[in-house]
Amino acid sequence: MWKIPRDFFSFFKKTSARVNIFPRSAPALLTRTGKKSYDDICAGTAGREKGFCIMKEKLSARDYVSVASMLFGLFFGAGNLIFPVHMGQMAGANLWPAIAGFCITGVGLPLLGVAALGLSRSSGLFDLSSKVGRPYAYFFTCLLYLTIGPFFAIPRCANTSFTVGLEQILPQDGNMKLWLFLFTLAFFIAALLFSLYPGKILTWVGKILNPLFLLFLGILVAVSLLNPTAHMSQVAPQGDYVSQPFFTGFLDGYNTMDALASLAFGIIVVQVIRGLGVEEPGAVARCTAKSGVFSCLLMAVIYLAVAVVGVQSRGVLETSENGGIALAQIARYYLGTPGLLVLAATVTLACLKTAIGLITSCAETFAAIFPHGPKYSAWAVIFSGVSLLFANFGLSAIIQYSIPVLMFLYPLAIMLPLLALCGKLFGHDRRVYGWTLGFTLAAALLDALFALPAGMQSLFHAGAIQKVVLRILPFSGLGLGWICPALVGLCIGLALHFCGKKPA
């Protein structure tokens, strides 16, 4: 999913736009310049004018390709493929509106987050969310990192590896939970060791792994498309995909968590673009958007192809409990046991690399925003232990319990970059941020409540509350009840900005 360099979080602190460390995730760009820092590049061919680089308005074609490749590598990962394949099995004949909704949240919103970081000149997520207030910045930053870290995304990496690989070749007896524990224990010991003692082997694995995985995926997709077991029109949609395919796909795109990741790690891309000489915020945002067109199109094509494979598998396979099982069953059907083993090994290594990056980045973040708390190594051990605990609940449980949290976080992760992109219109007035996100947060809490598992809903009397909310709040039946409250909060904030007393 996300490749996070350990030295990235030097950007996280409030520094000038010209930081002296480049992310390791852009080695090609550094190799081209032969430099190690932004200042070194500025002192080179461009020269200096009163301590600043001569700024460019746009990148060269070669630079656009480099940044686009970086964006693709930052957001695309093996773990995300379990969602479009399962969506394909569920959506059936209604795949087209479903994949359109999925791509908006799974592809478009991550690009929005990166562009917002570039346009607002923020030095990272904490700086961006501080526009609301420091207490909110601590709350939102911690919750977001815990979500894409030890609570859900990291355990999901281990579980996806187990579900696609070892679970498919082990005897289906009563010892599966023991095997899951042993596998996840080994997985997180390896992830922790690499997080504490990173080496060049990860860079080498990444360079080999991504092309290998894409090649294998291309073979699987090609074989499946050329030998469909069912045509799309013959596959009946299931669940909410029957009546609301677009909005159901839109909400299923939350599961990729890439919009959250864009706010956490998008500053990497922004700093690389600035390092190439594009400094004006609007130009940075434009360059990000242009670079993102290629990466977004590629991700959308991959998601679509995998979703179609999911649909066409329904001729011989039942709808699976989760996408990890579906992907493994499809690989076994078309490519046999050898193909399944190759898929399992590739996915396991890819997910391990993702888990290492996430443990590293979460530990760096918490060590940075809580300087008087535990050190980096202690946070890494804590997050690895928590991830091990949650991983043993199983992949389906992790996905199920992540949904309410994502229903709460995503509206905030949508509105914050939108406000940052439009911030010039209201001078980035904190009142606009506060009122908008305050109303959004309150409504998102209701959406999260209604997305809880059935047993927990009865505990909080969610059914009775939902009946009232459905009558008074538009779009709440679609899981988008936050939209109107967000607009109300925005109107109040803008009214205070343009008509009220200016803040001191």
Locate each region found by the language model.
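Hydrophobic, membrane-embedded alpha-helices of multi-pass small-molecule transporters
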Residues: 65-76, 146, 223-230, 239-306, ...
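Membrane-water interface regions at transmembrane-helix termini and the short interhelical loops
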Residues: 119-127, 186-209, 275-278, 388-401, ...
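TM-loop-TM module centered on a large, flexible mid-protein loop between adjacent transmembrane helices
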Residues: 124-130, 302-352, 359, 368, ...
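Membrane-interface loop-to-helix entry segments
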Residues: 196-224, 402-414, 433-443
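Hydrophobic, small-residue-rich membrane helices and short re-entrant helix-turn-helix hairpins
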Residues: 197-208, 246, 269-298, 316-328, ...
